[in-house]
């Protein structure tokens, strides 16, 4: 079933409202019409998240889960507590960092191949493996304090995006 979207008149470039929503102390929270101007990486530690996109995709994930949402789409997002309090963090990924990761995976590693097809989805999901949560937290905290160089940030982004590279849609979304 497709839902009708009424995007907000103001584009949300920095999705700070989603970042600060975690502090609202509610059992569930819905935000509608968020326009993603950049790709977003979400680390869902606990809780449940449901996302409906403007293209009609419906995504449901429970923590712990890593979620990649491609840019240039409008989403409706609902977050809920499950047995534990909702806990998530997100990082906006600029296009240059994603392009650098794409080039690294495609040109420096011969065992990866990029399909030449248009993606049918605009999201990727991956369970949070050992070390991924720590790298995500390091990158998340460094974005706030600006304590890492751009080269180190891009290296950490490549590490995080490597969780998705075996998905058929990954290269088309990067």
PLM regions and their residue ranges:
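Intrinsic low-complexity, intrinsically disordered segments enriched in polar/basic residues
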Residues: 1, 54, 58-59, 143-147
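N-terminal regulatory/effector-sensing and dimerization cores
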Residues: 10-118
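An amphipathic alpha-helical interaction segment
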Residues: 120-174
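Intrinsic disorder/low-structure terminal segments
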Residues: 4, 67, 170-173
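Short Lys/Arg-enriched alpha/beta "domain-start" segment
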Residues: 1-11
């Amino acid at each position: 079933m497709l839902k009708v979207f009424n995007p907000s008149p103001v584009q949300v470039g920095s999705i700070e409202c989603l970042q600060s929503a975690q502090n609202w102390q509610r059992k569930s929270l819905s935000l509608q019409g968020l326009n993603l101007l950049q790709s977003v990486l979400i680390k869902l530690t606990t809780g449940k998240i449901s996302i409906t996109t403007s293209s009609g995709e419906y995504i449901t994930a429970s923590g712990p889960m890593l979620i990649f949402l491609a840019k240039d789409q409008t989403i409706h997002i609902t977050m809920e507590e499950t047995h534990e309090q909702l806990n998530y963090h997100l990082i906006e990924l600029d296009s240059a960092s994603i392009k650098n990761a794409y080039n690294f995976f495609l040109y420096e590693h011969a065992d990866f191949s990029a399909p030449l097809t248009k993606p049918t989805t605009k999201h990727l999901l991956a369970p949070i493996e050992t070390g991924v949560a720590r790298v995500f937290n390091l990158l998340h905290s460094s974005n706030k304090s600006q304590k890492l160089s751009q080269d180190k940030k891009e290296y950490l982004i490549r590490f995080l995006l490597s969780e998705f590279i075996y998905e058929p849609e990954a290269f088309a979304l990067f």
